[in-house]
Each structure stands twice: as structure tokens, then as C-alpha cells.
Amino acid sequence: MLILVPSILIAIGDPVPLPTSVEDFLQPGTQPDDMIQMLDPLSSSNTCQACHGDYLQESFHEPWDGWVGNLMAQSARDPIWHAALTIANQDATDSGEYCIRCHAPVGWYRGHSLPSDGSALEDGFFENDFDGVNCQICHRAVSPVAVPGDPVEDDAVRAALEFPPGDGYGNGRLILDPVDSRRGPYSDIPNAPGMNLHSPTPAIHSPFHQRS
């Protein structure tokens, strides 16, 4: 439609998005294809609540409560983000896939980021794409850069990557352990046989998890 204004000709219509594709937004780090080889799937936060929540009367002291009310837990449910996702796709074709990588990483790693409008994301009890940045995403993360004191398991995970992130590890360029070996900041974790209820493998002390 054309609107005539003195000395101005204004064209009004649907905006035309930039002709981009998923490849234009490719970032290094662990890829969805790598997840196919994952020995252990990314569990939802529901599997964590049984032990890490609902055991104290003052629940704000519990790890579960500290996560469930923060922005990480809501990153894939936030209506403002969903509105921004729509705008991103209107501006550049399939650019929303890049947004999903950070805001709904479980869904992204499970291969549910296309269509890039988030319509393929699934809400399940054991695997929930709407979990946001959940417990598994953080506690299975591997330091992208080797530093003194790194657990020995990290070297093998980094070496197996097809697209290592190098020194620039922002923008969702996470590296995830394909095995459910949880990492954390504490060095006094009981690791006797049968003590790790998450996995047959021991929990891992990770200096990477001592800084945010």
C-alpha cells in the first residue's frame, strides 16, 4: 500500500527479513550432533528437586529454591523473550535459532531449535526444553580453556570437539560432558563407591565452577 503525503511517498507493508540461514549464526562449542553421541541425556530440573529441594522449612536455603526463582530458570518461559524471538525472526530468517541456544539450551542440544520460532520445544517431566539454563547445563559444563587444576576428564571432552570455542567462549559456546559427570566448586565431595547418586562416575571438583 502507498500513502501519498506532500513531498513524501511512503510504502507500508510487511517487512522483508534478511535472507540469512542457521549457518550464518553458527557458533563453536558442543553441537546438537554431538549430543546424539551423548551417553547420558540432559535431565530436567525435576529430577534434581527430590534431593536438592523440599527438605527445609525455610526453603530459601535450598539449592533448588535458589535456582527455580531466578532468571536462569525462566529464560525459556519469559514472555518478553518470546516476543523478542518473534522480532528476531522477522528481522533475519532463522536468527531465532541462535537465541534458543542460550535461552533454551536443553532444547537446542536436543535438536529442537528448528523451526526457529521455538514451536518444536517440548515440555516433559524428565527432559524439559523450557527448563532454561538448568542444573545439568551448568553442572556438566566443561571449561573451554585449560587451566591449572582442571579435572583430567576435561581434556578428553575438549579434544573430542569438532568446533572448539577457543578463547572466545561467550554467546552460548558451551562445552558439555557427554557423560553425566557433575562438576562443582567443592573439593570435599564424598566419592566413595555408591556415594554419587547422579551417576556411576564420581562427582568432579572443577575450578571452572568456582567463578561465574
Named regions from a protein language model:
Residues 1-15:
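Sec-dependent, cleavable N-terminal signal peptides
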Residues 12-45, 49-131, 140-211:
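Sequence context of c-type cytochrome heme-c attachment sites
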Residues 134-135:
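Short beta-strand-alpha-helix junction that forms the catalytic/metal-binding core
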